[in-house]
Amino acid sequence: MASSAQSGGSSGGPAVPTVQRGIIKMVLSGCAIIVRGQPRGGPPPERQINLSNIRAGNLARRAAATQPDAKDTPDEPWAFPAREFLRKKLIGKEVCFTIENKTPQGREYGMIYLGKDTNGENIAESLVAEGLATRREGMRANNPEQNRLSECEEQAKAAKKGMWSEGNGSHTIRDLKYTIENPRHFVDSHHQKPVNAIIEHVRDGSVVRALLLPDYYLVTVMLSGIKCPTFRREADGSETPEPFAAEAKFFTESRLLQRDVQIILESCHNQNILGTILHPNGNITELLLKEGFARCVDWSIAVYTRGAEKLRAAERFAKERRLRIWRDYVAPTANLDQKDKQFVAKVMQVLNADAIVVKLNSGDYKTIHLSSIRPPRLEGENTQDKNKKLRPLYDIPYMFEAREFLRKKLIGKKVNVTVDYIRPASPATETVPAFSERTCATVTIGGINIAEALVSKGLATVIRYRQDDDQRSSHYDELLAAEARAIKNGKGLHSKKEVPIHRVADISGDTQKAKQFLPFLQRAGRSEAVVEYVFSGSRLKLYLPKETCLITFLLAGIECPRGARNLPGLVQEGEPFSEEATLFTKELVLQREVEVEVESMDKAGNFIGWLHIDGANLSVLLVEHALSKVHFTAERSSYYKSLLSAEEAAKQKKEKVWAHYEEQPVEEVMPVLEEKERSASYKPVFVTEITDDLHFYVQDVETGTQLEKLMENMRNDIASHPPVEGSYAPRRGEFCIAKFVDGEWYRARVEKVESPAKIHVFYIDYGNREVLPSTRLGTLSPAFSTRVLPAQATEYAFAFIQVPQDDDARTDAVDSVVRDIQNTQCLLNVEHLSAGCPHVTLQFADSKGDVGLGLVKEGLVMVEVRKEKQFQKVITEYLNAQESAKSARLNLWRYGDFRADDADEFGYSR
């Protein structure tokens, strides 16, 4: 027991009973109480105390199941009110008690006082005073305690309290109901509304016996969604507790036993009712989980009405802290770094219906399996034709629908990946093939769990696990709920309808079938297709939905590096850049919807033609990225000009297949200026910077996407491996990375080193300059150097104009240009070259208005008169505009024509 105290007294008098203390655990009846001590490292000891000198009615007792002829014993009058009086007064309270008598059978009789000493309320006297117990007959009032009991009884009689009231007390006898004929109907009739109840018995931490009020149904309630360690019954009838079973039972007893609670009846299982017990101090289900006394169980967690995710979170809390039953717990992803547990990646391929291939920010590829789901399977595989080759995608019911759902939803998109567990590699057995190590994860896009969406459409099923198997989806309950909905609604695999059949003809390499299809495909013009496989940069396998066939497709007009091939007796090595070309094509078109134009076929039955993705010609893209060369057969194609233009641009960059390209020397012929005509070939550019001397920097719009991709990859790389401050020693002329005022990193070139705190840099892709401390600089990785992508900012000057020498006038002109064209797209045409930079005319993209001519019209600049014949028409237009500005006395001309006297002095020429 918790503690004891010895009352004082003279050594010569009668022995004074020892005062002991405890906490009321349970009230057995109006005169029998169980007292327990304080817990110390486990459930405390307990003892039954029978109140001395009084008697209360016996509570109802159910007949023993081993005695078929026995009958249930009902409550005696006023027995239940007496029990309730003590229950409400004493449960969980600290009391003190004395033992006055102990029988040979071990029954103890004594007095119980509410509080810490015998000055507290005498429980026996209170019972008698309320008319809920009587003084035992035959007891002689020979001591003060018995005298007080007699007085209390007389007072109760006089006040007609309890059993001394009129009537026989039959209204206090409960109509106890030990069985329920239809538990399911009983549960449903309460519509999951809380029912008042008293917990009468705790079998283990998660199973209790409850008295439902006001109808007195005595039912066994199992807590929904969890299971505590239990007591295993041995052959000799004894019970052996599982680890922490006794502790879990005490945890529930100390909080719920004989407490007033509310129970939500949620379902039933084997005549036992599943429910959730609500107490003002909290939810015992969640508390048991959080303290490590229970684990979640899949078979009943779905009926838990207060949110299964709360139970999983509570269990996870205990697991992470290795509390009690989880003391030896090891997380499925314990060996993974946080960056490997959660990351964002781009989906590159869908593998059947339960796995995807993603591209990480590092550029690496990784296969991710969707946690806890199983793709459609072929039923009755033993009955299949052994000679027929199985094509899972088309022959397994709903596999194609599942793959298409994932393909359309995910391909090319960025998804959030949360790794749930790593399934280790397993060797092959007689019935199960070998499996390599698998990374299983929850994949979401736009907040949607892809596995859950698949299951809800009936395109996958949920794997059932052993209860102790923790390697499962972190959203396993949602998957189970989604599957239940799919079954209820008859979706997909759970449908009673006829299974969809996909009759897809594979004519790859079948020359005869290919010849039959060729005329149809040629006449069809552009046909829709899905790229199913990429063999090399220019060789693909396509699925044509309208024709429901698979074909091998070769890109026309190009010569792509050949990959490695396995030949009889040897392996033929691939040509340089063959792997890069294959990867380029894969990343661009694999499992994408494309359009194809079939022109012809080869001897092996492979179709030859043009493939378009998002309006771009794949052949042209491969040539543009220096991964293919133009083939002479392209001459008769309408795409020949585009191919040649792309090849010429690739040659100039001298990358990949053109890395060793040497331009053939051409004898230079000086043209006669009078015979040359002005060439007007405007190209789209993006103006990024205007300098103080009215030069400007532009980016080529056609290569803008390459720059965006490089910047994204570079910043991801920097985020993963940030430069160490001060570790970079800048040198003049060196390329580096610099952190701009917006906090982002850009490619730059060191122009001047004044001191470690003053480094002059030039941003090579934008044309602006800045002075920075060396702490905001870092080494430029070779993966993002100018060899990978040349500097994108090119400097130009306006043709046909003279920039004012006066500082204020020049500032006005620069400000006007900044307002009009900085950070906008324009059209640029190179007019003539000079020692500094090319001189160009620039047009607004929308109105096609000449920017330089506009400056002349505003009187902000003067015309530079050139003598070349091809420019005379343009010069005349500029001079006319200048005369108009002069007449209107705009800006430079506001004081008239100043050039007559001081033109030479100020650097102007007429």
From Swiss-Prot:
Q: Which residues carry this modification: Phosphoserine?
A: S426, S645, S781, S785, S909
PROSITE patterns noted in UniProt: TNASE_2, TNASE_3, TUDOR
At which positions is motif Nuclear localization signal?
A: 321-325, 388-392
GO aspect biological process, one term = miRNA catabolic process
The molecular function terms of the Gene Ontology recorded here are: cadherin binding; endonuclease activity; endonuclease activity, active with either ribo- or deoxyribonucleic acids and producing 3'-phosphomonoesters; nuclease activity; RISC complex binding; RNA binding; RNA endonuclease activity; transcription coregulator activity
Q: What is its main location?
A: cytoplasm
TNase-like domain ranges (all copies): 18-166, 193-328, 341-496, 525-660
Residue numbers carrying N-acetylalanine: A2
Which domain of life does the protein's organism represent?
Eukaryota
Q: List residues of cross-link (Glycyl lysine isopeptide (Lys-Gly) (interchain with G-Cter in SUMO2)).
A: K513
Main EC class the enzyme belongs to: hydrolase
A GO cellular component term found in this entry reads: cytosol
Q: Which of UniProt's keywords are assigned here? A: Acetylation, Cytoplasm, Endonuclease, Host-virus interaction, Hydrolase, Isopeptide bond, Nuclease, Nucleus, Phosphoprotein, Repeat, Transcription, Transcription regulation, Ubl conjugation
Q: What does this protein do?
A: Endonuclease that mediates miRNA decay of both protein-free and AGO2-loaded miRNAs. As part of its function in miRNA decay, regulates mRNAs involved in G1-to-S phase transition. Functions as a bridging factor between STAT6 and the basal transcription factor. Plays a role in PIM1 regulation of MYB activity. Functions as a transcriptional coactivator for STAT5. (Microbial infection) Functions as a transcriptional coactivator for the Epstein-Barr virus nuclear antigen 2 (EBNA2).
UniProt name for this protein: Staphylococcal nuclease domain-containing protein 1
What is the species listed in this Swiss-Prot or TrEMBL entry?
Answer: Homo sapiens (Human)
